[in-house]
Amino acid sequence: AFPEAKRFFYEHREETKQLVDEVTALCIDYATKQIEHGIDAFQLFDTHAGLLPTDMYVEMFLPTICRITDAVRSRGIPLIFFRKGLGSGLKHITPDVCDFVSIDWQTSLKDARQMVHPKVGLQGNIDPHLLFAPQKEIAQTLESYKTFFQKHPNWIVNLGHGVLADTPLDN
């Protein structure tokens, strides 16, 4: 479980760094295989980023994320980076990190746009639970995003996380 992993990180920093380096190398290998098989874009998910203090994440994990993103982008593939729950840590997202950053539903698009470098596009932010609402309400909510898109055309409409397993297919 994550609490035990986080404790391990604090108790065994060097071992954690070694483990993260090994996982990073595997991620780069995986991304390279995806590129070799013809992907048009790559999305890197860091679903647990928000469980760590921002300073710790920036110091210990963002450099490894950048190794992965550099490997992908050096092959001419655009990269979308998803950091769930990081909130104010979005200010560390620059064009050197990614082309687009996915925003979870816990951070407003307006706040994200103010924090993230203007050359980095935004994706997401729609609460996956919205898809349980009546279709009329879904349409109204999506309509409310038009104003943001008109001011910030480098936004990709998307959920702020994955589709939930029991989401009605019609929605």
Regions found by a protein language model. Give the residues of each.
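Active-site loop segments of alpha/beta catalytic cores
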Residues: 1-171
